[in-house]
């Protein structure tokens, strides 16, 4: 049953990787047998030991992402609990449909199973009903993308040819794309300083975006030349042409780009916004509120904030962590904080921000995302932090929530985890798959 729930969670896109779970009987696992013997040797069974036994020993090596392991252990705690043993008709979720039937004859279990709905409600997996909408949207998008790829490339009547469409689109993007940043001007105005790590962050961001815009500009110029017969249409340019024709970001761009799942039009708009934010920073100095989603490499900004605090207060940076304060302001702050930074641009998926009670709350029906107000990053010594009545919410760059597993044990799509005030136990939001996203897909 646990395997079925985990695979369904993956289908509903609340887990990060497709699970390749151990298919043999759990009892055959040597570590499980060893711990099982130590459990049954006691007169009172240790239910609490079963969760880590199965979660860490049986599945631990196969579920490599630590956020997936957290979800796995949370789901296990639903099944390995004294309430399930002691209560008759133990309910697995809200409502009267899904529960563990009371002890009875074999046929009573069969009758209960036959009474269950054919299509399971997301609540049985701990998810909000909106999870079905997310799944259906993604399946529909995949279907439409496949249909687009099968359409003929010839146009009839007075419609524009594919070549004309791509050429006009290329010229439009080129007209909007700004010139590369002058690295030397940035270095002269914001030199490397021990007291201000943000200067280094800015310079690194400018260099990264220059590389990206150079690839975008060169590919668009060459596409226009190839369509006019001035140069040969290489396989790389053909890939750019085909991607632009169906509204996708070309692989050549994605290889040099920050992670993004946006279609081509939204991607270009987003890129131009990021470039403008950097230009404003260069012209007017560091903003009072940083657009967290606008950084090419978000971790460098977080490291810069930590370094500034560590150097100012002469504390080893290894001892530094962040506390988080969700403010009531949505877009603007009058002054910069003395320590830390204000950030904006995060979207909450799987829950919403209750602005009245200043805690995370249940999503409203058919509203999949909720923008978070400005958040204050407050660096400090980690051993002095108090972690009470919070949900440790992971932040991802895109809604895919998956990437390459890095040496830290986190996905490359993962940014950090922020503590959000909550009036419910963490388990509730873990099962909901609640996370923050730096950008949406549209």
Regions inferred by a protein language model and the residue ranges of each:
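Long C-terminal appendages of very large multidomain proteins
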Residues: 4-6, 14-442
